[in-house]
Amino acid sequence: MGKIGIFGGTFDPVHWGHLLIAESALSQMALDWVIWVPNPRPHNKQAVLFEHRWEMVQVAIANRPGFTIFPKLAESSTSTYAIQTLI
């Protein structure tokens, strides 16, 4: 898969700042991929339903080379940090 970066967050909503950070990481760190990891249940935050946030990220990164999204997971009943999703 090459050199990858992991970009986790609530993305509520995903916005240009998120895209700029991910684009900068992709180019400045010479990454092959940036994997976006929307947090299913943010810690100490209320957020839009995970399904909606996941779809918003998918739309935002569509047609952007080097970006992909972590496979959709079932929403947890407890709060999590993005890193816990990967473990």
Task: Annotate each PLM feature.
Residues 1-87:
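Nucleotidyltransferase catalytic core that binds NTPs
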